[in-house]
Amino acid sequence: MRIALGIEYDGNGYFGWQRQAEVDSVQGQLERALSIVANEPIGVFCAGRTDAGVHATGQVVHFETNAIRNEGAWTLGVNANLPDNIAVRWVKEVDDSFHARFSATARRYRYVIYNHSFRPGILRHGVSHYHGDIDADRMHQAAQALLGEQDFTSFRAVQCQSKTPFRNVHCVNVTRQGMYVIVDIAANAFLHHMVRNIVGSLLEIGLGNQPLTWMGDLLALKDRNQAAATAKPHGLYLVDVTYPEQYQLPKLALGPLFMLD
């Protein structure tokens, strides 16, 4: 049978999502816990591979198993065998047409900036700290140039392996909640480091170092070297993945949980 899981994790301390030899990964920890509960080797497929230090509240995975277990075993049982910073949020049996990556029609990320003169203590691994006077309204206005299907070469990592630089951004909003500035962006898919590269450039606009037209200018240049530095990883969360209605997957609060949704 094929099972889908909703996963939440704190990416701090992991070398990203993907299983790698001799380093700790989210995928490796999840597969270990699932294999214990299923009493057989389990391999998982995810909706989107996150980098080192990046978090998720809405990661979706699927796996195949011959084990017959109830919902409690796949949630409480797996959680009991996971580190405290990884948790199963929901479970659902799906038909064989479902694939966590290839069935997805959109992904949504939130980037959380702690905008204060002094760095945070408790949330130091859950937000990215930037001081200076950040104008969120200015960032939001500039970000609208990203909407639609466009060539995002200026915002892709050098090591990005995607065959095409084109992505379709469905919506992007920048808002302020007290000391937090949140960049919320959804697209059909994202290039490697695309969100963090976009945020890095939006910050330059928010700080008044670049004009409102800069995002559009960068898109036209198609040159990563012309854009700003990549934003820090700790503020980035994969918060939602969209699938066709036929799969009836659960929908929970996007998070992260310390924010107003």
Curated annotation (Swiss-Prot):
Gene Ontology biological-process annotations: tRNA pseudouridine synthesis
Coiled-coil annotated spans: none
Pfam families: PseudoU_synth_1 (PF01416)
Catalysis performed (reactions): uridine(38/39/40) in tRNA = pseudouridine(38/39/40) in tRNA
Alphabetical list of InterPro entries matching this protein: PsdUridine_synth_cat_dom_sf (IPR020103), PsdUridine_synth_TruA (IPR001406), PsdUridine_synth_TruA_a/b_dom (IPR020097), PsdUridine_synth_TruA_C (IPR020095), TruA/RsuA/RluB/E/F_N (IPR020094)
Family per similarity comment: Belongs to the tRNA pseudouridine synthase TruA family.
Root EC class: isomerase
Amino-acid positions noted as binding substrate in the UniProt annotation, renumbered to this chain: 109
SUPFAM superfamilies linked: Pseudouridine synthase
NCBIfam families the record matches: hisT_truA (TIGR00071)
Keywords, ordered alphabetically: Isomerase, tRNA processing
Isomerase among keywords: yes
Presence of keyword tRNA processing: yes
E.C. no: 5.4.99.12
Protein name in the entry: tRNA pseudouridine synthase A
